[in-house]
Amino acid sequence: GIDKGDYAVFKGIPYAKSPTGDLRFRPPQETEAWEGVRKAQEFSPKCTQRAKSSSFYEKEFYSEPQYQVPMSEDCLYLNIWTPAPSSIAPPLYPVAVWIHGGAFSSGYSSAISFDGEAYCKRGVLLVTINYRLGMWGFLTLPELAEENGDGTCGNVGLLDQIAAIRWVRENIAAFGGDPENITVFGQSAGSMSISV
């Protein structure tokens, strides 16, 4: 991660296996532990989407060059902003998980508008997540339903969100977060996801 003094940022942490090859259009699979130290200093690629967001989103959320990232199908990563430990801090910080908007077809977790510094200053740990978008996250085909065995397919973008929240619950204590005090919130498609 990156030590910012009052807080630390851990970028590009995988919460599921890469959804490529045989895992494309499939529910997210639990990631395997990695060997050694993961630096977690660079944002991951954003999930594959249209090359340019709508002018509103481009202007409001994704205009800062240092927060722009390449696209890739290998995109199931999250970012964590955590307050620095202090003698007056609670044993574990409350956790806020942010789900970005973008009409389920655009957006990403590392946009400047979703930076967690302000949350850390208030004693809240922030997590932002990527999830599959457009046809990569919501394609429904009879062939895919047949392969699943239960007759269902599609909505893997929503399953990605569930997998990310599950990862947070299982691992956030290692970053100073309270797994029993998690609030999920979002904007546009992100807030709609929470109500499903």
Regions found by a protein language model. Name each.
Residues 112, 161, 187-190:
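Active-site-proximal structural scaffolding
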Residues 99-101, 184-190:
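Acidic/histidine-rich, metal-coordinating catalytic segments
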Residues 79-82, 169, 173:
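Generic structural signal for well-ordered alpha-helical scaffold segments
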Residues 1-158, 179:
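Non-catalytic accessory segments of hydrolases
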Residues 191-196:
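Short glycine-enriched nucleophile-adjacent loop
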Residues 161-169:
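Short, well-ordered amphipathic alpha-helical segments that serve as non-catalytic structural scaffolds
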Residues 156, 168, 175-187:
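Alpha/beta-hydrolase fold nucleophile elbow
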